[in-house]
Amino acid sequence: MNKPIVGILGFSDGDATAHKMLAPIVQKQIDVIVEALKKDGRIEVIVASDIVHSDKTAKGLAEELKAKGVDGTIFVNAVFAFPAFSVIAAKNGKGPYLLAAPIYPDWPGMVSMLAAGGGLDHEGIDHFRVAGDFNDPEVLEKTVTFAKCAMVVSRLNGQKYGLIGGRSLGMYSSTVSMQEWMEKFGIDVEHIDQLEIVRKADEVDEAQVEKAFQWLTDNVGKIEYNGTSFTPEKLKTQIRHYEATKKIIEENELDFVGVKCHYEMSAHYCTQCLSAAFLNDPYDWDGSKEPFVCACEADSDAALTMQILKMLTGDPVIFMDVRHWDQANGVMEFCNCGSQSTYYAAKSDDYKENLANVTLYPALDLYPGGGCHVNLQTKPGKATIARLCRRKKNGETRYYMTIIPCEFVELPKEREALTTKEWPHVFAKLPFEHQVFLERFGANHCHAVYGDHVDELKMICRMLNVDVEMYE
């Protein structure tokens, strides 16, 4: 996983004599911060070549760090520095910005941070603050969280999303405005026809298909061929579609994708379930790889939510449907129509352990193109569910993210047959009454990763000017 890169910019007094006296104090605090971050090892730091002590140095040093590709910038306030310098630097540098001040009585660094923050507020420049000793684990963790979130926001800008196909099954909440995405997130939307998958599937090398087929045969727990809609040859067709999709991603330099599937592909060629599973996985038959976000049914806000979660954690992300409230077990059942990252079958770094818990079932008769669905049950653990949605109110449409901390639990395998046994299942304990979820949630799809990432997602939303919605 790539590390965040943060710039470190120290601020001093604008009076030449005072600056000469105060510069060593500022430098000492810069050194403390840099040493703590380097020792921790989760962040790469780039320190400005000088300390800000004038309008010109504020502009020039901020531009210097921006040119070096930082994801965000830490403003170091160790003494009382002219607050105007922070405003000038923020106007010309690379945000998001974290104002950092030590807490000690010798010098008014905290005063400087508050004055600088007030100036940024006046200019409408949102920012974050941390005060204390950077060797304090709590202060360090706040800084690392800022850096991780800044990296997600910074690196989303300039990405390219591949919308393969169009709106699926009439789902309004799956479509987005390419102009809005560019303006708000800096993401370009590239429309690609699904026929490209079919065309490129014919070009896939047969040796690669046989390699993949043998790997699946050797490692997947069960492959339930039925002799009609799901045969070895149909599985090979799905392999070709996966390889074709990878080629489309490579040739178009895509960063994440959504694939329509229903019904053109699922009715006439095959389901895209194998692609949705192994693109999101950290492995395939060619070995270890970075998970690549693929959203089913061309749900673009799903894909963006998943991309944020993947960039934040480095982990595969679950795509799931909100399917059923199980009153008897007190769990919400999430069950996507056909596929999910197989990593969650055992949450193991060993693909063999994961795939041993996977079953490839024949696609439902609803999808006459045939092929397989990818069945598994997600292993227990603390997790975070998230979903970007949009709401129009008083003529203004705003993005918001629903964030739900939860606990994945395991139920007997036979319980899956209550809904659709062929599909992947996630059972989750929610921290609120399920009626709240059903009354307020703004989509039929949601997404999840292991771990508690609520605070990080809240910070990312603030950086993106996205509202946060949490249920109680």
Regions found by a protein language model. Give the residues of each.
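N-terminal glycine-rich anion-binding loop in soluble enzyme alpha/beta folds
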Residues: 1-51, 173-224
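Conserved anion/nucleotide-ligand pocket segment
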Residues: 8, 148-180, 184-187, 328-354
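N-terminal small/polar loop signature for handling phosphorylated ligands or for N-terminal nucleophile
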Residues: 48-91, 205-252
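Cofactor- and metal-binding active-site motifs of prokaryotic enzymes
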Residues: 51-157, 168-170
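Short Gly/Thr/Asp-enriched flexible loops that form oxyanion-binding sites at enzyme active sites
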Residues: 81-94, 266-284, 425-429
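Long, internal scaffold/assembly segments composed of regular secondary structure
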Residues: 215, 219-312
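A glycine-rich phosphate-binding loop feature that marks nucleotide/adenosyl-phosphate handling sites
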Residues: 258-266, 321-339
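Extended hydrophobic packing segments that form well-structured cores
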Residues: 359-472
